[in-house]
Amino acid sequence: MTTRNLDKLASIDAQLRQLVPAKVSEDDKLVEYDALLLDRFLDILQDLHGEDLKETVQECYELSAEYEAKHDPKKLEELGNVLTSLDPGDSIVIAKAFSHMLNLANLAEEVQIAYRRRQKLKKKGDFGDESNATTESDIEETFKKLVGDLKKSPQEVFDAIKNQTVDLVLTAHPTQSVRRSLLQKHGRIRDCLAQLYAKDITPDDKQELDEALQREIQAAFRTDEIRRTPPTPQDEMRAGMSYFHETIWKGVPKFLRRVDTALKNIGINERVPYNAPLIQFSSWMGGDRDGNPRVTPEVTRDVCLLARMMAANLYYSQIEDLMFELSMWRCNEELRVRADDLQRSSRRDEKHYIEFWKQVPPNEPYRVILGDVRDKLYQTRERARQLLGHGYSEIPEEATYTNIEQFLEPLELCYRSLCACGDLSIADGSLLDFLRQVSTFGLSLVRLDIRQESDRHTDVLDAITQHLEIGSYRDWSEERRQEWLLSELSGKRPLFGPDLPKTEEIADVLDTFHVIAELPADCFGAYIISMATAPSDVLAVELLQRECRVRQPLRVVPLFEKLADLDAAPAAVARLFSIEWYRNRINGKQEVMIGYSDSGKDAGRLSAAWQLYKAQEELIQVAKEFDVKLTMFHGRGGTVGRGGGPAHLAILSQPPETIHGSLRVTVQGEVIEQSFGEEHLCFRTLQRFTAATLEHGMHPPVSPKPEWRALMDEIAVVATEKYRSIVFKEPRFVEYFRLATPELEYGRMNIGSRPSKRKPSGGIESLRAIPWIFAWTQTRFHLPVWLGFGAAFKYAIEKDIKNLRMLQEMYNAWPFFRVTIDLVEMVFAKGDPGIAALFDKLLVSEDLWSFGELLRSKYEETKSLLLQIAGHKDLLEGDPYLKQRLRLRDSYITTLNVCQAYTLKRIRDPDYSVTPRPHISKEYMEAKPATELVNLNPTSEYAPGLEDTLILTMKGIAAGMQNTG
């Protein structure tokens, strides 16, 4: 310990109480929750690693807090000296402790949000939601607003809600920094904390919960946070599917009941039909092969069978509860006849069930029917298990459910019979919930989208045309390609046989189509073509599906993401719709995906957001001309730089008429945990998406005035030029980026199954959008989010001072512009150029220091212009909740930032000398529990402990920032 007077060192807990803003409202329990978790954790830290280490944690925290108060860079240096003087084991423990404390702060927040939500529901009042500066409506408020304020009839609301669809597409983007083992422990900590503050808790309950809390915090701290091997796509799929087990499976029927209740409260005495497609789930895990060589046809087959097995297992685990519930003897004639037939034909085979294992008596007809459903579910599950394990199954396909209609039929029969016998209230119990689950999840739990780059299809067709000796498809013009594709699609002859010469890549593409042909059609959703530019890209996939004998072809979805592609998208889609063969094929429905990540990386956030807005307007116009219903599929990331931010705000700021009751949106990486990690979060996510989609359709946001459009067009050009002049044209930029951020070390984190680069060599262009953002988030500089905004606003205001008033008017009256600015403001609130300056000082060569200073001056300039336009004196002045939450975690994050900067220095500069603490002899070191941590990574090529310390800081900062990639 340094010579600072220990007696004067305040505990973190006391520090917190001084630091934290006052309670934001009466029902604000965040500080209490946070302090309780911290107290418990510090006790555990002392027990496991001794008092010295606990005091070092407190010293680091205090120095960070002092820095946060005055932003004095000397404090960062002092903190750096404390951190670099630690031996390798202690250094890992400190990084682990701060990372852990940030995870605990997140859990305290989630419990606080749930608590305030319950308080709100008790009072039936409205409140500004805490995760953004705008009020979020629940489903009941949305209905009342539509009927009361906007004078829609209850019937109109009912018709709109039962015909709308929100399809949430879970993707395994490599940003879920927390291991599944830890997510489960975090869930239990959350539960303990929520129960500890329940009103009716007894002293004994309290004591037991406190012990459980201590146990779970210790178990989480004792779990290795670092993945020692990269996850496979199957691992990612299993991780994604675990949310269905934990929350989504039960959450969907519970949410739909709330919709029923809300309808009742506006005078509609009907329930949402059980087959109304309100919520759907899809997945990219194991289907997204764009730039991921690890997603092979075998992987796709595996994840589909795995999902079918999980779905059958979930239904199977619930069917006996339903059999218990439906014990009635009275039924209609149709059901009686069916039950009698089953009784006669059933010979009990050797399956030993726990309940209803003997033949069900004939006076329980519903149980007879459901017993047969149970048998089939058992066979369905076992067949999928055998196919997954051995590639074949002894169970014949006809003994299982192969499509959803077969599965629904006996359940619908039970429902009709109960209604006919006057037992409607019983029919609307668990049976209705079960029917709704079947309609939502089907037999495959989620539908798997396939994504592939357009070039890979071109390679296959080029091989075919060369084999047929009719030329090189790759060299043909677009017209020639279309002509040939359409003549083949209109004809009947097969294009190629088994003698087609195939490279490994070509075989991979064709085998993927064969897997689609082999598995049941309900396993799959869309076939998405990335880097799509022309109608031939779509027709190529249609032809390959036909050639590989896909009986029910997947809908083909072009994905437009770069700025130029977005600009050309409406014309490309119009050309596609003008092809008669294609119009007949799609039956008046088309889906188009727009990508937020690459457009942001290509042109900066402001221009990307505006281009995405305009492209959607134009695409909808094209679809109207051809009388096609267009569904927009939004590929949003978790971070603001990749189109992230609160979901309902994003929806309500889309252009009018672009959602129209059908929305598809990706839920990525760590956002899955924030959306579905816990029951109330799942409920809230389903509610937000449904309410916002309904409101957007029935009460569209305003269209921008012509003068707003003109100004946006003008400033977007300036923003793009400024962004590209720095990111792509400035010769010093790539070197600066690699030195000033942990981008080069990112690959060591084993976060995802996908490589972080599209091509092994190359500059910023080849870097994926995710590591690009992740790296800047780590240094709290967030460059991709704000770069370009300042130059654009400065240009507009200098050109004509009236433009400042116009920008302020746009902020106040136009949801799209407001949301864009608010999200950047939130990122500024999380940023800190002082931290970026420390990284520069330690890691960047001196000749680049002036470049770093230039970027930081642009950061400050952009921030002040942004506040001027929003009419705010301080960042987040309109959102006290978020401000409080960010202040609470700043000191933890700062310690990790400093730790990361100095660790990178030691990794990159082996000659960097540090002064180790005196009096830690080798024998003493080996006896310390902390040294065991160094041995977890025996193969590291760096000095002991450095690599693990670095990875732990990355994970901790990711947890603190909450939207990492």
Swiss-Prot record:
Gene3D superfamilies: Phosphoenolpyruvate/pyruvate domain
UniProt cross-references to InterPro entries, sorted A to Z: PEP_COase, PEP_COase_bac/pln-type, PEP_COase_Lys_AS, PEPCASE_His_AS, Pyrv/PenolPyrv_kinase-like_dom
HAMAP family: PEPcase_type1
Modified residues (Phosphoserine): 11
Cofactor(s) the protein needs: Mg(2+)
Disulfide topology: none
GO molecular function: phosphoenolpyruvate carboxylase activity
Protein role: Through the carboxylation of phosphoenolpyruvate (PEP) it forms oxaloacetate, a four-carbon dicarboxylic acid source for the tricarboxylic acid cycle.
Any one GO biological process: leaf development
Active site (UniProt): 173, 601
Protein name as it appears in the record: Phosphoenolpyruvate carboxylase
Pathway: Photosynthesis; C3 acid pathway
Family as reported in the entry's similarity comment: Belongs to the PEPCase type 1 family.
